[in-house]
Amino acid sequence: MPDIVNRKVEHVEIAAFENVDGLSSSTFLNDVILVHQGFPGISFSEINTKTKFFRKEISAPIMVTGMTGGRNELGRINRIIAEVAEKFGIPMGVGSQRVAIEKAEARESFTIVRKVAPTIPIIANLGMPQLVKGYGLKEFQDAIQMIEADAIAVHLNPAQEVFQPEGEPEYQIYALERLRDISKELSVPIIVKESGNGISMETAKLLYSYGIKNFDTSGQGGTNWIAIEMIRDIRRGNWKAESAKNFLDWGVPTAASIIEVRYSIPDAFLVGSGGIRSGLDAAKAIALGADIAGMALPVLKSAIEGKESLEQFFRKIIFELKATMMLTGSKNVEALKRSSIVILGKLKEWAEYRGINLSIYEKVRKRE
């Protein structure tokens, strides 16, 4: 088995310090226009950003999506993120816990999260390829109990696995059968998330047919995991690097993924993530059809700079979210979901070509 601990460290190093954010790709969020209301009818002080994340109330419709863990230095990053997430009352996901299940010495970098964040929703994380390799209920329960998780994310990353030097692109259909059986035995919900390439309506419908109702888009336009693996290939002289260059713009852009999932599964719980870099981006994702917005890379970069930097980052994000709510006349998150939007450009073309009637979608996104 390759040294997945060192691989995780390298992933974080490349993500934080190399040019992989939005490389050769777009979220299409620029094609979403929130309609300005010159007389909002509310005051800034009465705006309520609280919402629900499954059984728990959170202070804002924003979450930290899973990133890292597995070694002491990664545990320190997780600790900072968890402490700040607890202070701001927002959910936090951890990176893949495969390393902690297979290497006991890696567990502390994950368990620290619940120790310093006793009340917020924490989301465990395992990969779909591990289901093919034989993971079952025992491993899922271990991942959940390890951090006293409120939910568990199962990540899809076929594009990353294809170009990874030591990748395991194993996605046979029986993995979904196993996931369906496991979900019936768990006490917490499963969220299926992508890893930077988005969820299409075909994938959403397939997952839904196996009992999955919770999704995280992780669309194209944010952290480019094909680029990360390309850099790792280059460092090793691996011939896959040249091929990876041709796929840097592969995937479903975040805004398109939000529309596709919401349109095909109207009752889904949906995290809109992938290139969310501001409170305005978060508001657009929610108005477009997500329940909450998720972000990872900007949180990681701020956490590396320190706790104060991350606190300032979240203050900025939440202020921008509230500013958008003010300027759209949205007193609360439910009102933001129903706010007026205009869909332009490539996103409109994408939706229409994919057979999505935007007049019908207008009612779907507003949950009417």
From Swiss-Prot:
Keywords on record: Cytoplasm, Flavoprotein, FMN, Isomerase, Isoprene biosynthesis, Magnesium, Metal-binding, NADP
User: Which residues are involved in binding FMN?
Assistant: 65-68, 96, 125, 193, 218, 223, 275-277, 296-297
Per its record, the protein catalyses:
isopentenyl diphosphate = dimethylallyl diphosphate
Q: Where are the transmembrane segments?
A: none
Localisation per UniProt entry: Cytoplasm
Which residues bind substrate per the record? 7-8, 96-98, 160
Q: Name one GO molecular function term.
A: oxidoreductase activity
Q: Which cofactor does it need?
A: FMN; NADPH; Mg(2+)
Keyword set includes Protein biosynthesis: no
Question: Which residues does the record give as Mg(2+) binding sites?
Answer: 161
Keyword presence, Magnesium: yes
Query: What are the EC numbers?
Result: 5.3.3.2
Task: State the GO CC annotations.
Answer: cytoplasm
User: Which Pfam families did the record assign?
Assistant: FMN_dh (PF01070)
Where does the UniProt entry say this protein principally localizes? cytoplasm
Q: What Gene3D superfamilies does this protein's entry cite?
A: Aldolase class I (3.20.20.70)
CDD domains associated with the record:
IDI-2_FMN (cd02811)
Broad enzyme group: isomerase
* A Gene Ontology biological process term: isoprenoid biosynthetic process
Describe the task this protein carries out. Involved in the biosynthesis of isoprenoids. Catalyzes the 1,3-allylic rearrangement of the homoallylic substrate isopentenyl (IPP) to its allylic isomer, dimethylallyl diphosphate (DMAPP).
Supply the NCBIfam families for this chain: IPP_isom_2
Q: Which HAMAP family match?
A: Idi_2 (MF_00354)
Please report which protein family the annotation says this sequence is part of: Belongs to the IPP isomerase type 2 family.
User: Quaternary structure per UniProt?
Assistant: Homooctamer. Dimer of tetramers.
What is this protein identified as? Isopentenyl-diphosphate delta-isomerase
**Organism, as annotated:** Saccharolobus solfataricus (strain ATCC 35092 / DSM 1617 / JCM 11322 / P2) (Sulfolobus solfataricus)
